[in-house]
């Protein structure tokens, strides 16, 4: 790969006087602090949609009333993008992966709900409705649909495509959130859909 080496956070922390490309998922503030301290030149390829979301969450978090509200992120625990988002709140944001987990929120406190950019719009809307139904009228609930339309807008087309073919091979990395969402849409309309990520498969 033309001399490009992939590193993890542990290896990044030990680097000095190097040049590092950050991938699209975004990074928590600590990564940039480490880069300055260790004289690491950052080439920031963070997706602009993710960057805007990080800023939005940080602004919400630094407001004076943040003790009285919950910042909630609908996303996958441990996902690179989610780690970057939670990092904007010094680890205070609550991450929920599915509707079931929304039931454990404190509905006597205000809630600000955001979403990982690559999550399911349908599930996000169900979570919004659930919170609306259960939150106390004495507090406020604001939600921000921060799901990337590059993925969401493809869903109607991919459903149509999968329904019009007998067999679908969906080529994607097995860990890709975008890939999983789009493949699941194929599978819903055509059970004879298969996720593959290599020529061997």
Report the location of each language-model feature:
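The feature marks the mature, well-folded catalytic cores of soluble enzymes
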Residues: 1-201
């Amino acid at each position: 790969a033309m001399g490009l080496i992939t590193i993890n956070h542990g290896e990044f922390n030990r680097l000095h006087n190097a040049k590092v490309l950050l991938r699209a998922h975004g990074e928590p503030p600590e990564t940039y602090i480490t880069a300055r301290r260790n004289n690491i030149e950052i080439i920031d390829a963070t997706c602009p949609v993710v960057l805007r979301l990080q800023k939005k969450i940080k602004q919400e978090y630094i407001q004076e009333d943040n003790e009285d509200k919950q910042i909630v992120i609908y996303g996958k625990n441990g996902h690179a993008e989610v780690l970057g988002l939670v990092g904007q709140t010094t680890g205070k944001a609550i991450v929920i992966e599915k509707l079931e987990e929304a039931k454990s929120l404190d509905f006597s406190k205000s809630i600000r709900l955001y979403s990982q950019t690559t999550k399911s719009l349908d599930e996000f809307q169900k979570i919004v409705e659930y919170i609306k139904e259960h939150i106390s009228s004495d507090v406020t609930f604001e939600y921000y649909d921060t799901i990337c339309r590059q993925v969401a807008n493809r869903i109607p087309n991919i459903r149509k495509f999968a329904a019009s073919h007998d067999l679908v091979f969906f080529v994607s990395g097995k860990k890709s959130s975008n890939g999983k969402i789009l493949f699941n849409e194929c599978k819903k309309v055509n059970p004879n859909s298969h996720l593959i990520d290599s020529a061997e498969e």
